[in-house]
Regions:
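Conserved alpha-helical scaffold segments that buttress catalytic/binding sites
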Residues: 2-319
Length: 319
């Protein structure tokens, strides 16, 4: 079932999954630049706002045990609240609204996809959910990796595909069958920085051994629209509903340093927006997550407003 032209916005003010504060301010920054009024002015018929958390879930310095994560309890509580909120959003209307989730952090994604899978499974016939993971990082660090520093956000994809060593408490975010929400049949890595030291050879070995589709940042920079079209074609016959995840560290910080941690991907802001426009133009896309925006890097919120304006234009153009 295609999403309607109405938009449900879910705000997730959290930065408890990393070691740099600031991302918890991003949802309010999107509100401060007028995202709701911009959507109304652009002709989006209905906009609904939802707050997944009663208060921001903020970073605090803490230790962690081997095989675990820093601030594990609060991170899992955030995921539980997000899954509950998105599930309620789906139950509120017959034809689901387009889900726009504004973080916050990438590590809320297992909860989002779990809610999407549960909604998809309730359809007749049951539907399949796909993910386009726009991120410079593979985020495949297992909690049991000897080099792990306990950063929950860096374990994001490890929990999505349920790598060995993934936190047992994250298994609740799954398909209704109990399987992981992501595998090579329904997931595309888009804009991956192949030269980033944090993307280790063993991460790429896992992806290629499992036949994941990986679209490098260099190839996105070269031809954004074509890479986006190829990504949609890859998923076309494999899934019925697509979630797009935009981690803004996929955008090169040379001229757009909005991300929490800079990542020199070579993909300029306008090029990433060209790719995103193609992706959001697909009728199968039912949601967009925006993560890793740090307003502390954006005095005056000019970059946040620029990003917001592009997203609004894309959502307003949806049929």
């Amino acid at each position: 079932m295609a999403a309607s032209r109405s938009v449900s916005i879910t705000y997730v003010p959290a930065d408890c999954g990393s070691i740099i504060p600031g991302k918890s301010k991003a949802p309010q920054a999107f509100r401060d630049v007028g995202i709701v009024n911009k959507l109304k002015d652009a002709g989006v018929p209905s906009i609904f706002e939802h707050h997944a958390l009663e208060a921001p879930a903020t970073f605090s310095a803490t230790t962690f045990s081997a095989g675990g994560a820093r601030n594990e309890d609060i991170n899992i509580a955030v995921c539980e609240a997000v899954e509950r909120t998105i599930g309620n959003n789906f139950g509120a209307t017959g034809q689901p609204d387009f889900q726009l989730i504004l973080g916050g952090e990438c590590c809320m994604l297992p909860a989002i996809l779990s809610a999407f899978w549960r909604h998809a499974n309730s359809q007749s016939p049951p539907q399949r959910v796909g993910l386009i993971y726009i991120d410079a990082d593979t985020d495949l660090t297992s909690p049991t990796d000897p080099s792990s520093i306990g950063t929950f956000a860096g374990m994001n994809m490890a929990h999505l595909v349920r790598l060995p060593g993934a936190l047992p408490r994250m298994e609740q975010f799954s398909r209704p069958s109990g399987e992981p929400v992501c595998d090579a049949s329904n997931t595309v890595f888009f804009g991956t920085n192949m030269s980033l030291p944090g993307n280790k050879p063993e991460h790429f070995k896992y992806l290629f051994d499992k036949n994941f589709k990986v679209v490098s940042s260099a190839s996105v920079a070269k031809d954004p629209e074509q890479r986006a079209k190829e990504t949609l074609e890859f998923l076309q016959d494999k899934v019925d509903i697509i979630m797009v995840h935009l981690d803004v560290d996929s955008i090169d910080p040379g001229t757009f340093p909005l991300a929490n941690v800079p990542n020199f991907t070579g993909v300029e802001f306008e090029n990433m927006m060209r790719a995103l426009k193609v992706l959001l133009g697909s009728e199968k896309v039912g949601g967009l997550t925006v993560a890793e925006v740090n307003p502390d890097h954006d005095p005056g919120l000019k970059m946040t407003e620029r990003l917001t304006s592009h997203i609004v234009e894309m959502l307003a153009a949806r049929k």
